Design a protein with these regions (language model features):
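Expand to "…catalyze enediolate/carbanion chemistry for C-C bond making/breaking, isomerization
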Residues: 1-205
């Protein structure tokens, strides 16, 4: 209805193609089915507990999952094992996902949690940590490897070539990375420039 009304230039000429919803139960996932098809639907799941039932329900309606990897306080940042478990469940269920919150930076490290002067600091995941962990898991890496990737803080440990990305003696081919992008659809950042600037600074772009 929104898109029908706003299609006309007199009403803004805008089009919504993606929606995001928080869900806490499989029943809430099923209720979100009305958005699937009309929109690209991402359903944000809590990961304090095993999200398998939620991810399975998301697979059942053909939606995508969303995970929150940071927050405005240090205690809002999930543990690495929780993140890996989410990635594993998505892989097992064939569910694509996006990750958001705290992913302004390329690699894990201690950063300010907001842009405010004197903001509290916390140890955040980098977007490369999350995306590479998902890619390595897709080609068979176990949870131990994924945990180590999520904790990687040394840019020298990552080598980017035309046909591969290599990390500490293990590699993912470019074709496999492209395939992994169908699983790891996107990451969220408040800044468009920060991720690009950091990749340039690390000579990874």
């Amino acid at each position: 209805r929104f898109n029908d009304y706003h299609r006309d230039v007199r009403h803004g000429a805008v089009h919504v193609d993606t929606v995001e919803l928080k869900v806490a139960t499989p029943a809430e996932v099923v209720a979100a089915d009305e958005f699937v098809g009309a929109f690209d639907a991402f359903l944000e799941v809590p990961i304090d507990e095993d999200p398998d039932a939620l991810v399975a329900a998301i697979a059942g309606i053909g939606a995508k999952a969303k995970v929150r990897t940071g927050g405005l306080t240090a205690d809002a940042i999930p543990g690495a094992r929780q993140v890996v478990r989410f990635l594993r469940r998505c892989l097992e269920r064939g569910v694509a996902f996006k990750a958001t919150a705290g992913l302004h930076h390329a690699l894990r490290g201690e950063y300010a949690l907001t842009y405010d002067p004197g903001a509290p600091r916390g140890v955040l995941y980098g977007f490369l940590n999350v995306l590479l962990a998902a890619a390595f898991m897709r080609q068979g890496a176990d949870d131990g490897v994924a945990l180590a990737l999520l904790d990687e803080r040394d840019p020298a440990a990552i080598e980017v070539g035309d046909r591969f990305v290599r990390w500490r003696g293990q590699a993912v081919a470019a074709d496999d990375l492209r395939a992994a992008r169908h699983d790891a659809v996107a990451f969220g950042s408040c800044s468009f420039r920060e991720p690009v600037d950091e990749l340039h600074a690390l000579s990874l772009l």
